[in-house]
């Protein structure tokens, strides 16, 4: 069971990152991976349901870090759910609801997609102590944490840059009455 959880977590990470670059993987693969991501999220929640139920039941009694992690996990779930719903609605390969030209849905999908990745990195950061539990060398552990922080900051800055410089924003403002 533990190995399955780790495999699911790794797949969630890889697919989330792969979904970011639609130009590289194409629309069809983006939609297929989005569906796979939704399925993996459901499996991830089911595999961790006992823990989720326990923390929910004892929320007031849990420590601050667990409360923060729990709130972030709920936020991640809401963000991913919004991303997936918008993605399905604007899809034009696997599904076709003829809404792919809905600028509001496209922008919501883009924003939530980036927020999903950022919150995923926060989630991973809060779990790094569990991930590196077996690492005995403190200097190596500290170096990994520092590298992780720089990677997260770099990716976050890149996502903000690409979001603010993407063609969707230009299109939105060109066609608005503002």
Give the predicted meaning of each segment.
Residues 1-178:
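Membrane-embedded alpha-helical bundles that constitute the cytochrome b-like, heme-associated redox core
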């Amino acid at each position: 069971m533990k190995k399955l959880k780790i495999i699911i977590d790794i797949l969630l990470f890889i697919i989330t990152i792969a979904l970011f670059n639609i130009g590289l993987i194409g629309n069809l693969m983006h939609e297929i991976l989005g569906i796979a991501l939704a399925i993996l999220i459901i499996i991830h929640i089911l595999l961790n349901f006992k823990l989720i139920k326990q923390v929910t039941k004892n929320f007031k009694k849990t420590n601050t870090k667990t409360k923060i992690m729990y709130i972030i996990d709920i936020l991640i779930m809401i963000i991913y759910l919004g991303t997936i719903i918008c993605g399905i609605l604007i899809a034009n390969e696997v599904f076709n609801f003829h809404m792919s030209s809905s600028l509001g849905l496209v922008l919501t999908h883009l924003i939530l997609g980036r927020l999903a990745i950022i919150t995923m990195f926060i989630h991973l950061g809060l779990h790094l102590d569990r991930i590196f539990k077996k690492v005995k060398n403190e200097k190596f552990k500290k170096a990994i944490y520092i590298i992780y922080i720089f990677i997260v900051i770099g990716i976050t800055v890149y996502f903000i840059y690409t979001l603010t410089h993407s063609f969707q924003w230009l299109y939105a403002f060109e066609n608005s009455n503002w």
